[in-house]
């Protein structure tokens, strides 16, 4: 199918369909979406969640306490926002059941650049997936999306409708608009003359979806919400005639759908008054002497915390406060999820194929998240950041607390302050374009750009010092360690085999040492007594600064014996035990004198050295670095190493 046929097919599928009122009632009998409220239709569009048993994945089990959680495919690109999404779905479920939430404003509260607008856009987009049914008369569709059931009286007609068409009583009671009431009189009370149109909500055409923004204090009035008289029609109609009214307000257009109010609490208070009755009573007054207008939809508002605090502290606004269902949308606090946000943003730009050195996005994510975290008590903020990402630190940091302990101490406002994803992405843009020749990103340029930006932003001195401490006290040393390991692993071709040999040898020596037995090497025939074994073990332990060798050796041998039982008697992989892995890596790379000629970009004295250097560069490029980045990062690493 070519693009033109594909477009036409889509256009035809979205065309209006017209039915008689009798046909519509027959549809109600078979399809409950024909009379479902806005929250129910939005839930249909969101769909069922994919249930995830977090007990099966160690990282998730630490974050979600082994609970079974639901993940909604409709929100799969909203990373680290499970809690906010769950609250939104909870609001919709309760509203769909006709509970108090149906009468409340769904209010997304969060810091700038935290994803509130993106969530609102996704909800509006989902609203377009399920059609609505609207009254029509004389070929003209109701300007306020009157639902056909508004024609019926709950006291008089509910029993018949429930018995014959399976329409529950609670779906009756929405008032008729002045437009529908006028047509009813014109038809002499004959409701069969009405038609019903099946319409697809549309952001583009503002059908059942509308958006309003705060205007100037002096010139914005409630007509932005409720509409006003259309002076062009006064030539043919009286001022209080429903046909003289311009139903252009956001509440008029959003009936049966969703109305988004951007930065709601920046609007003058007089503009917000129609929302009180629209939410609680399902109707509101227009600006002229016409009868009340119906509203049976969702009001979605969002703003930053400062506006909300100011609004909440004003005693005159108490009527509103009780009608607001708050969903907090904080910044992402998990490194892995923050990285996915950057990847998503990059994929929607020209930089999607630009080289990005390993560690760049992770380093930026670490910096962003450190800025958002509250300082913990009796523990390191760096450990807290890692625990928030689902890491287990029981082997590396005995002071680290559990995820829940950190959350409880930080309180509900954690993640509502700090550097935004928007700020981080602007940093990333500058890093990619830092080099005038190569469009690529690497952590060394990232450090430079971040330091510059911290100075330019003119943060309060204490905050600027805190950010610089994150950079110089943690991120730069951490990255120096990472790139050192990258360089060293690229240098050692048989890295994995070499590491496994050291591991196996260490375990054997430790086992014989613990049992106080001599050991004869099967390959060389060399005999090791307990003292010789101890000397060999210390060669591996000393570079890592093991303070209590006896306990360490017992711990390792016990771990390996347990692992062998589940591994057909074979030793586990040398990387499987974090403590020993660190020890082996430090032993492997304690002597780097022979490493320097290979990784430096100086002129080589022999073809053998040149070949080793070229092989090293090729292996680094296989890891995801460009040739230029290999040189830059090696030179940076050697400088940092020398200065420390």
Segments the model singles out, each with a brief description of its role:
Residues 1-40:
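Long, basic/Gly/Ser/Thr-rich N-terminal segments
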Residues 33-644:
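Conserved ASCE/P-loop NTPase catalytic core
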């Amino acid at each position: 199918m070519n693009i033109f046929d594909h477009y036409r097919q889509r256009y035809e599928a979205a065309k209006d369909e017209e039915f008689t009122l009798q046909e519509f009632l027959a549809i109600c009998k078979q399809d409950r979406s024909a009379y479902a409220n806005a929250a129910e239709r939005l839930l249909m569009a969101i769909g069922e969640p994919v249930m995830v048993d977090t007990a099966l994945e160690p990282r998730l089990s630490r974050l979600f306490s082994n609970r079974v959680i639901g993940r909604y495919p409709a929100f799969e690109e909203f990373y680290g926002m499970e809690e906010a999404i769950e609250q939104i779905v909870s609001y919709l479920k309760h509203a769909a059941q006709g509970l108090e939430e149906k009468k409340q404003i769904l209010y997304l509260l969060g810091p700038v650049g935290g994803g509130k607008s993106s969530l609102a856009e996704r909800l509006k987009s989902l609203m377009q997936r399920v059609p609505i049914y609207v009254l029509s008369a004389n070929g003209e569709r109701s300007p306020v999306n009157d639902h056909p059931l508004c024609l019926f009286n709950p006291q008089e007609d509910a029993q018949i409708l429930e018995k014959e068409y399976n329409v529950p009583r609670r779906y009756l009671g929405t008032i008729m608009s002045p437009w529908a009431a006028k047509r009813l009189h014109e038809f002499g009370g004959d409701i069969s003359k009405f038609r019903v149109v099946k319409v697809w909500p549309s952001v583009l055409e503002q059908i059942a979806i509308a958006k309003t923004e705060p205007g100037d204090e002096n010139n914005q009035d409630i007509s932005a919400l409720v509409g006003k008289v259309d002076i062009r029609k006064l030539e043919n109609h009286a001022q209080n005639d429903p046909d003289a009214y311009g139903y252009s307000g956001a509440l008029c257009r959003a009936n049966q759908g969703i109305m988004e109010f951007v930065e709601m609490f920046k609007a003058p208070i007089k503009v917000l008054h129609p929302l009180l009755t629209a939410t609680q009573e399902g109707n509101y007054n227009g600006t002229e002497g016409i009868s009340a207008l119906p509203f049976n939809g969702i009001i979605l508002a969002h703003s930053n915390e400062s506006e909300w605090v100011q609004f909440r502290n004003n005693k005159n606004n108490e009527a509103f406060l009780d009608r607001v269902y708050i969903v907090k949308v904080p910044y992402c606090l998990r490194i892995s999820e923050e990285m996915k946000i950057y990847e998503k943003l990059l994929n929607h730009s020209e930089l999607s194929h630009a080289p990005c050195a390993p560690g760049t996005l992770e380093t930026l994510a670490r910096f962003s998240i450190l800025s958002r975290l509250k300082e913990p008590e009796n523990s390191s903020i760096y450990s807290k950041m890692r625990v928030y990402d689902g890491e287990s630190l029981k082997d590396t940091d005995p002071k680290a607390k559990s995820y829940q302990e950190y959350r409880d101490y930080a309180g509900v406002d954690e993640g509502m302050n700090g550097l935004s994803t928007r700020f981080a992405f602007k940093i990333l843009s500058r890093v990619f374009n830092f080099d005038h020749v190569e469009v690529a990103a690497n952590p060394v340029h990232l450090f430079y750009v971040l330091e510059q930006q911290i100075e330019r932003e003119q943060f309060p001195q204490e905050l600027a010092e805190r950010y610089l401490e994150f950079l110089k006290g943690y991120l730069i040393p951490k990255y120096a360690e990472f790139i050192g390991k990258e360089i060293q692993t690229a240098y050692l071709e048989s890295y994995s085999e070499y590491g496994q040999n050291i591991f196996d040898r260490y375990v054997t020596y430790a086992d014989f040492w613990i049992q106080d037995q001599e050991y004869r090497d099967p390959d060389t025939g060399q005999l090791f007594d307990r003292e010789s074994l101890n000397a060999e073990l210390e060669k591996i332990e000393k570079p890592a600064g093991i303070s209590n060798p006896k306990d360490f050796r017992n711990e390792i041998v016990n771990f390996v014996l347990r692992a062998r039982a589940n591994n057909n008697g074979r030793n586990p992989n040398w990387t499987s035990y974090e403590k020993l892995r660190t020890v082996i890596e430090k032993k492997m790379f304690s002597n780097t004198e022979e490493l320097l000629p290979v990784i430096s970009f100086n002129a080589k004295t022999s073809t053998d050295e040149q070949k080793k250097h070229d092989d090293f560069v090729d292996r680094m490029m296989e890891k995801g670095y460009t040739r230029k980045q290999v040189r830059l990062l090696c030179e940076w690493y050697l400088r940092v190493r020398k200065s420390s």
